[in-house]
Amino acid sequence: MAHPMATHPRLQRRHGARSGSSRCRHRRPVPRRRSRSRPRWRAARAHRRHHRRSGPGIGDHPADRARHRRGGRLPAQPRRAAARRPDPRGGANTDHHAAPRHRRAAAGTSHRRRDRLASNDSQHHAHPTATGPRPRTTVRRRRQPRITHPVGTADHRTRTALRRPRPADQLSAALRSALEETRRLSGLADQLLTLARADRPESHPSAKAVPITPLLHESVARFAATGADITTRAEPDLFVSIDPDHLRRILTAVLDNAITHGDGEIAVTAHARDGAVDIGVRDHGPGFADHFLPVAFDRFTRADTARGGRGSGLGLAIVAALTTTHGGHANATNHPDGGAELRITLPTPRPPFHEELPRITSSDTKDPNREHDTSDQ
């Protein structure tokens, strides 16, 4: 017999009782309790997100997981304070794990950039280059503007002249300017080729006994035709051991340097001294700056602050390279009476060898014993 309260309509509507139901009608059913733990798939997804965001943590390594399955203990968890970084603005420390995701990412990026800059700065201080030889990258950085500037200038002026119709005088001026830059580029290419050949011993031409006086007067006459005031004083019958083309380049470079940066009269001297010939070129300009003298013969180096100009910085470098190739040396100084002075020392040719004596063969010699035997007969 059913409980009398179980047949009440309100209780039946509340508990969902039905006629013929097997549910116990006198007891209120207990609802299922919802679990507070997340589903496994959701926990795995959160773990993967954290792993991608912060990298593998303690216990994530396969060896740690295997140790945990065997009942072993995982390594000790780091303290939360270890994850706190000092605030670069001088404020309180920032807990990156407690901050939102976008702030954590921004803070991590800034710290990584700061660490990278600090590492680069420490490497720079650990390997200084100011006291050692200049690296090749420095030479390349100096070389690039010298090569690209004439090309860019000629290209720009030519395109500007052809952009729209212009009067004949403006077009002629633009073309003359482009031609000047083209000549500068051609001269720069020639200088670079000369330096490249000087660096290769197998490409050096054979040295000859060259009289210096005719070539010196030839170079001086070529520059004097442009209006330069040059005086020459050279001893007669001076010979140097060098290639004639290299000697012309050396004389042209030192005279061009004196005319470009000097002022007034230019004095050229040549005399013999200690088995060599000393060539001196002195101008009456402001002279070399003290800081420029140690690097006067370096490539792509110019004393712009002291002597101004638009040179390529290769003239004196070519002089030093060609002089050293033939066993000489170059020196740059300031004259005591004012002005800059360049001195080139070149070796004199070796004295000619004596003529070889005729070789004595066996047929020319006579056996004294044989002569004695013949006389006896």
From Swiss-Prot:
Q: Which organism is it from?
A: Mycobacterium tuberculosis (strain CDC 1551 / Oshkosh)
> MF terms per GO, please?
ATP binding; protein histidine kinase activity
In Swiss-Prot or TrEMBL terms, this protein is called: Probable sensor histidine kinase HK
Comp. bias intervals (Basic and acidic residues): 84-98, 352-377
Kindly list the positions at which Phosphohistidine occurs in this protein. H149
- UniProt cross-references to SUPFAM superfamilies, sorted A to Z: ATPase domain of HSP90 chaperone/DNA topoisomerase II/histidine kinase
The record's PROSITE patterns line, in alphabetical order, gives: HIS_KIN (PS50109)
UniProt's post-translational modification comment states: Autophosphorylated.
| PANTHER family (UniProt xref) | SENSOR PROTEIN CREC
> Which sequence ranges are marked TM in the entry?
none
For this protein, the record's Pfam families field holds:
HATPase_c
Which keywords does this Swiss-Prot/TrEMBL entry list? Answer: ATP-binding, Kinase, Nucleotide-binding, Phosphoprotein, Transferase, Two-component regulatory system
Domain Histidine kinase stretches: 146-350
Q: Which GO terms describe its biological process?
A: phosphorelay signal transduction system
Q: Could you tell me which residues belong to the region Disordered?
A: 1-169, 346-377
